[in-house]
Amino acid sequence: MQRRGALFGMPGGSGGRKMAAGDIGELLVPHMPTIRVPRSGDRVYKNECAFSYDSPNSEGGLYVCMNTFLAFGREHVERHFRKTGQSVYMHLKRHVREKVRGASGGALPKRRNSKIFLDLDTDDDLNSDDYEYEDEAKLVIFPDHYEIALPNIEELPALVTIACDAVLSSKSPYRKQDPDTWENELPVSKYANNLTQLDNGVRIPPSGWKCARCDLRENLWLNLTDGSVLCGKWFFDSSGGNGHALEHYRDMGYPLAVKLGTITPDGADVYSFQEEEPVLDPHLAKHLAHFGIDMLHMHGTENGLQDNDIKLRVSEWEVIQESGTKLKPMYGPGYTGLKNLGNSCYLSSVMQAIFSIPEFQRAYVGNLPRIFDYSPLDPTQDFNTQMTKLGHGLLSGQYSKPPVKSELIEQVMKEEHKPQQNGISPRMFKAFVSKSHPEFSSNRQQDAQEFFLHLVNLVERNRIGSENPSDVFRFLVEERIQCCQTRKVRYTERVDYLMQLPVAMEAATNKDELIAYELTRREAEANRRPLPELVRAKIPFSACLQAFSEPENVDDFWSSALQAKSAGVKTSRFASFPEYLVVQIKKFTFGLDWVPKKFDVSIDMPDLLDINHLRARGLQPGEEELPDISPPIVIPDDSKDRLMNQLIDPSDIDESSVMQLAEMGFPLEACRKAVYFTGNMGAEVAFNWIIVHMEEPDFAEPLTMPGYGGAASAGASVFGASGLDNQPPEEIVAIITSMGFQRNQAIQALRATNNNLERALDWIFSHPEFEEDSDFVIEMENNANANIISEAKPEGPRVKDGSGTYELFAFISHMGTSTMSGHYICHIKKEGRWVIYNDHKVCASERPPKDLGYMYFYRRIPS
């Protein structure tokens, strides 16, 4: 095996208590029962500490337990030893040194370094032409820190040698967790660091590409060595082509090519002809810049001809990222960036905002010793541990240090370079919080708002004692429904975690400019001329707030006063104000062609926000409540049978309809549920289901089978005992509420009948006098995947009511045409100035684009 051969050519380690050759076998004998060879399915962590972001690149290296295969930095390995008694660890360390200089002053050319055997990312800040890497491995025995240099094939027992070799050759643990989830995780090309690029003056235009040999205009690949544009073949893209890109490689030997039309600020499709597989190029931006391509301004289209929306987005990308402005990097505690794992910017932006809130800082980082000391044996699978790890990584300043001054670099490089790690990789955190979620566990771009609610749900489910930091977002919404004919009203309350503001397009203050721009744009498109400068709709924030507070019609409203359907209107007000108010601008909608689109608007979001006028007032004098009577719906037996039979076996779901909906930008699981609950009646019917249900808290949750009859009884024990713990399956609740019954009524009926749908319907018909149980309040969380049930008077500060006056302290912006594509960044106000967090880059903001945000975070101003 190549890695084993590389390891066995490596010199011994240094710095600990070394053993004489004759003592090694005797020393290991007591520990042999604890040393394991990794089996299939074991997760071997050799790149990242379970409690910190230490790695083999760190000064203290990384210790891998030879029993659990968990990894620990120097500050945390003793904790694991004390807790488990495991004594044998493999210590991994990567050294970075300056290359030996030749007589002319340049670095001597070297062959491929055989001393590299760890699968680690290289330091992007170091020029690989000037530095070389050397990996070191050794066994360390605790508590005396005896060191056994590797390789030591003659002295070590065979089992230990095999175990060491298996650990070093193991693959990423994230692939083993769920192969389907991480199928898009690509290897870094071995040619990326030292790729030769010819200085031949080639510059690639932004469009109009064609193959240099056959004039094809699709499936084109740019060779990153000489800039040749040639057509591909089925080997990677499954598209048509004559294989000229592959022929060019065979003629010239230039290994890497990037597919034109896939280049975005987040990356591109790169193929290695030599390695014969898709790869990652960590220096892709530099390699493309060699041919005049700026990744920050690229947006993927198949043939390079930019559509209308693509052209409009250019300005958006530049403004939000503050391109063209020399931004000053910031370092230290609270100024640590998060590396992009490939469309993980939605997660990074939300977590930066979350950990700028003192309550989250105290709950996790403030309790770090206790959380780490009492973490389970596998801390990689514990939410609170991973939240604390991430929070400490962001707030400690340990991974955000300014570069060393040039004179100090010279002194350091004479011996050994000690690289400063800037930015942390949230791979372990993302793997855990997205586990079992079909969307967040993928490498696709996601909606930051949906992830925020998903995170709130995880915080709720994993609260630390009575402390729940997500309570700062929690508030009550009062919904008032009025029968237009009788004027009688009904008041209900629900829990929410964010305020969704509609975009009041009709209130644009520059309508004349917009009309003129649209005419000019269409004329330019028709005549194939350059498009005019973008004119963005300017929407007053007050208009959006007014649209939020205006009454809305209730479809199919059944008036209990009339005992019949009638016109009804609903208004929403705040029954309580949260400590931190999250405002989402509803920029995304659907066109007449079902294609998702984004409102490209500018909204004058205020720094100071006062919404006290939206405080709920409850039942007013003179108002009369609607009778609490259920609709007298009679369902014939044959209709019940049809209802049961329309739910098909999940294995029979029409996948073609699912994919039609998914291509419109809807979450895959939502599409599957839409097709399932509409009985495979086609994409159009399923689309209507999506439109009706897309605001529901479990919209993007995986499809789970409801129980009927005996199956429901058997499944009841899975969901818990009766009472508050027995939450009925959401699918059955949705079926009953779709018939016109109240949600609370449906839940109480299902609980009374052990989640049996037929018996629940009979129960409802036999209890027309249904009254809501006063012992509990059903709260429909606006959450990505949970409905939380709490008592009417819950223990602890579940709602932190107060003044409705707020100050803006953070906002998340989205660039692109859909939440399923594009890029997110975050701006946070710290120490009196705005800071931009763009993945791993953290800089002082010069022009924070507060008018183009997607999610806004406000903190209450004490009254």
Curated annotation (Swiss-Prot):
Domain USP as annotated: residue spans: 336-861
Signal sequence annotation: none
Cross-link Glycyl lysine isopeptide (Lys-Gly) (interchain with G-Cter in SUMO2), sequence positions: 311, 405
Alphabetic keyword roster: Autophagy, Cytoplasm, Hydrolase, Isopeptide bond, Metal-binding, Phosphoprotein, Protease, Repeat, Thiol protease, Ubl conjugation, Ubl conjugation pathway, Zinc, Zinc-finger
Effect of residue 233 to A: Does not abolish ability to stabilize SIAH2
Domain of life: Eukaryota
Residue numbers of Phosphothreonine PTMs: 122
Zn finger (UBP-type) location: 187-295
Reported impact of residue 739 to E: Impairs ability to stabilize SIAH2 and STAT1. Abolishes ability to stabilize SIAH2 and STAT1
Catalyses which reaction(s): Thiol-dependent hydrolysis of ester, thioester, amide, peptide and isopeptide bonds formed by the C-terminal Gly of ubiquitin (a 76-residue protein attached to proteins as an intracellular targeting signal)
PTM notes: Phosphorylated by AURKB at Ser-114; leading to stabilization of cell cycle proteins such as SKP2 and AURKB, but not MCL1.
Chain residues that bind Zn(2+): 211, 214, 231, 244
InterPro entries (alphabetical): Papain-like_cys_pep_sf (IPR038765), Peptidase_C19_UCH (IPR001394), Ub_carboxyl-term_hydrolase (IPR050185), UBA (IPR015940), UBA-like_sf (IPR009060), Ubiquitinyl_hydrolase (IPR016652), UBP13_Znf-UBP_var (IPR041432), USP_CS (IPR018200)
Residues annotated as catalytic: 345, 823
Recorded family membership: Belongs to the peptidase C19 family.
Function as written in the Swiss-Prot or TrEMBL entry: Deubiquitinase that mediates deubiquitination of target proteins such as BECN1, MITF, SKP2 and USP10 and is involved in various processes such as autophagy, endoplasmic reticulum-associated degradation (ERAD), cell cycle progression or DNA damage response. Component of a regulatory loop that controls autophagy and p53/TP53 levels: mediates deubiquitination of BECN1, a key regulator of autophagy, leading to stabilize the PIK3C3/VPS34-containing complexes. Alternatively, forms with NEDD4 a deubiquitination complex, which subsequently stabilizes VPS34 to promote autophagy.
UniProt name for this protein: Ubiquitin carboxyl-terminal hydrolase 13
Organism: Homo sapiens
